[in-house]
């Protein structure tokens, strides 16, 4: 499947800015809103597998504050052997300083059994800017500093794709610079294109993740989403690849 190419082609075929009347209403203040999703994943990179994934994203707006929470995971087996397993969680709080400028603080943790890192955890803080902030189009960028701690591990994969041996290395930590960008475009009243980029760079590793998705509503609460995600670690253990990609098809429930 080539979901990433499909999404890019669809995005190029529509106007950059949709009419404001086509955009969904803004979320209410003081109430947790969000979405849960589950579906199918095709993974390539350190593991080539077909697996299932789940994710929960929630957000709360209270005056100048916005809090966002993420929890996700994927799991797959091949011939009775675990061939994909990843769990991650993140929290970010933004505080508006002006109509366009905000301060942020965030925490992130990932446990991936096939990435070459037993875990990666970071805390970051900095400033962001809302480039577009309408109901139809939202684009923001942020830059900051923080601390990244990770624990490398050397893996040997067996013929079925499972891990046959695992050797933990000492944990490492370093100061990091971080850059992120978040984009959302309502293409119509039922279709939304979104993209989220994160870069964390330090002496131990540079992590780059990007999540591109196209969601189409099939009812008031349900949507079908196709996505293309990448994760690149520039300094993985010698036996492992730098780049992992995920192609996803999910059923999404909004609340």
What would you call each of these model-derived segments?
Residues 1-31, 240, 255:
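Cleavable N-terminal export/targeting peptides
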Residues 27-42, 64-69, 193-195:
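Transmembrane beta-strand segments of Gram-negative outer membrane beta-barrel proteins
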Residues 36-38, 69-71, 105, 125, ...:
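Membrane-embedded beta-strand positions of outer-membrane beta-barrel proteins
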Residues 36-38, 54-56, 89-91, 125, ...:
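Membrane-embedded beta-strands of outer-membrane beta-barrel proteins
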Residues 40-44, 62-64, 73-77, 109-113, ...:
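Transmembrane beta-strands of outer-membrane beta-barrel pores
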Residues 42-50, 78-84, 111-118, 173, ...:
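Solvent-exposed loop/turn segments connecting transmembrane beta-strands
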Residues 64-68, 100-103, 135-139, 187-193, ...:
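Repeated loop/turn-to-beta-strand initiation elements of outer-membrane beta-barrel proteins
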Residues 124, 214-217, 243-255:
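Outer-membrane beta-barrel "beta-signal"
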């Amino acid at each position: 499947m080539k979901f990433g190419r499909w999404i890019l082609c669809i995005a190029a075929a529509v106007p950059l800015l949709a009419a404001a009347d086509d955009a969904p209403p803004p979320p209410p203040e003081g109430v947790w809103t969000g979405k849960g999703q589950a579906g199918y994943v095709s993974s390539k990179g350190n593991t080539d597998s077909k697996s299932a994934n789940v994710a929960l994203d929630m957000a709360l707006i209270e005056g100048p504050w916005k809090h966002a929470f993420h929890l996700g995971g994927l799991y797959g087996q091949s011939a009775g052997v675990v061939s994909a397993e990843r769990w991650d969680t993140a929290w970010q709080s933004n505080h508006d300083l002006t109509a366009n400028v905000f301060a942020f603080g965030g925490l992130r943790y990932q446990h991936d059994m096939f990435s070459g890192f037993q875990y990666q955890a970071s805390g970051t803080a900095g400033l962001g800017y809302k480039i577009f902030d309408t109901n139809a189009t939202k684009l923001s960028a942020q830059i900051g500093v923080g601390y990244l701690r990770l624990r490398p591990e050397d893996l040997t994969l067996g013929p079925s794709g499972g891990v046959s041996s695992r050797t933990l290395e000492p944990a490492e930590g370093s100061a990091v610079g971080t850059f992120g960008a978040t984009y959302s475009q309502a293409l119509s009243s039922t279709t939304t294109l979104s993209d989220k980029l994160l870069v964390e760079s330090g002496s131990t590793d540079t992590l780059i993740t990007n999540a591109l998705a196209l969601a189409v509503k099939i009812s008031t609460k349900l949507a079908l989403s196709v996505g293309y995600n990448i994760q690149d670690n520039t300094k993985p253990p010698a036996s492992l690849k730098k780049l992992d990609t995920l192609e996803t098809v999910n059923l999404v429930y909004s609340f």
